[in-house]
């Protein structure tokens, strides 16, 4: 799929997720087969640009793949300024957030709350597109409530404003992440515009990915929560799309390598004083399958030192490997 002059290596995109899709996670998703990874949301409010959190989020240079940066806000001038400063910092695509359903974002009339105001949407899109010389994309939901699905109207407006690709999450703002995503609206949007359409929502495995592409006619898929603790999902899906065959489960040793490598990158990126806190949620996601009783995760979350985290993970996987060998030995002797 092409967005402006950028050719993606495949049709799988890692979704922007606040507090998750930082540089270490984006780099890992890219290595695991994502055709593009979009940055976590950056506020257009200039008052927060100088904070440590924003400073780290605005590091875009020397990153693998196409550097797509998402911005959020409701003031057209602020959004234009945010787009310019991120392009100056290395962004190659600007993505506009009109899909976030979080209350703290919607209270500021940002995210999916904007879908109620098409005129303001139009002003924001024009301002950002005119402000930068890189492609601008848009992420939305199907509407702000089940009885107010206006994604086709917004999609047509976006195309008229110069938006070069549109991502649609298959729920309304009111739905949050409850219930199942629906794809009829995404299919209707695909049939109503000529710009690339990216389907998002509940794409959790290779079979679902194939089904959503076939049903909606979308040009690409955006995967978010399903990649938490499982960044290799991009490789799994791409292999299935290419061959019709499923990859075998990732070996435990490879899970260990990826997890510990990810945690080391988090420690390095945020500093050991903060990195160990960021690492906790990622470890919890990685180990959902291997530590279902939560005992190790509770123990891990009490650790307040980066090096101790790595030691605990090494010991955990060593113990898990021994248990697996004993189980296999007992099975062979039966």
Curated annotation (Swiss-Prot):
Cofactor(s) this protein cannot do without: FMN
GO molecular function: flavin adenine dinucleotide binding; FMN binding; tRNA binding; tRNA dihydrouridine synthase activity
Superkingdom of origin organism: Bacteria
Top EC category: oxidoreductase
UniProt keywords, alphabetically: Flavoprotein, FMN, NADP, Oxidoreductase, RNA-binding, tRNA processing, tRNA-binding
Reactions accelerated catalytically: a 5,6-dihydrouridine in tRNA + NAD(+) = a uridine in tRNA + NADH + H(+); a 5,6-dihydrouridine in tRNA + NADP(+) = a uridine in tRNA + NADPH + H(+)
Protein name (database record): tRNA-dihydrouridine synthase B
Organism: Serratia marcescens
Originating gene: dusB
């Amino acid at each position: 799929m092409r967005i402006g002059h950028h050719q993606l290596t495949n049709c799988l995109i890692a979704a922007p997720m606040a507090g998750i899709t930082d540089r270490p996670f984006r780099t890992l998703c890219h290595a695991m087969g994502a055709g593009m990874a979009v940055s976590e949301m950056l506020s257009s409010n200039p008052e927060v640009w100088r904070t440590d959190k924003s400073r780290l989020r605005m590091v875009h240079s020397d990153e693998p793949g196409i550097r797509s940066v998402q911005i959020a806000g409701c003031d057209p001038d602020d959004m234009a300024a945010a787009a310019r400063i991120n392009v100056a910092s290395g962004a190659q695509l600007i993505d506009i957030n009109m899909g976030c359903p979080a209350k703290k974002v919607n209270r500021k009339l940002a995210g999916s709350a904007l879908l109620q105001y098409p005129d303001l949407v139009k002003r924001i899109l024009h301002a950002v597109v005119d402000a930068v010389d890189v492609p601008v994309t848009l992420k939305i939901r199907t509407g702000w409530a089940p009885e107010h699905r206006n994604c086709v109207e917004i999609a047509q407006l976006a195309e008229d404003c110069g938006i070069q690709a549109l991502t649609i999450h298959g729920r309304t703002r009111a739905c949050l992440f409850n219930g199942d995503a629906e794809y009829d609206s995404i299919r209707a949007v695909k049939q109503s515009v000529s710009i690339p359409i990216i389907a998002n929502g509940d794409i959790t495995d290779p079979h679902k990915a194939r089904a959503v592409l076939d049903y909606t006619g979308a040009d690409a898929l955006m995967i978010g929560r399903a990649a938490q603790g499982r960044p290799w999902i991009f490789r799994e899906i791409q292999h299935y799309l290419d061959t019709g065959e499923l990859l075998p489960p990732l070996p435990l040793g490879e899970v260990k390598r990826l997890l510990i490598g990810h945690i080391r990158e988090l420690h390095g990126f945020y500093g050991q004083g903060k990195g160990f806190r960021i690492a906790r949620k990622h470890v919890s996601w990685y180990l959902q399958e291997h530590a279902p009783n939560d005992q190790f995760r509770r123990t891990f979350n009490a650790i307040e030192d980066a090096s101790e985290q790595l030691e605990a993970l090494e010991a955990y996987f060593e113990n898990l490997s021994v248990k697996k060998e004993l189980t296999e030995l007992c099975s062979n002797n039966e």
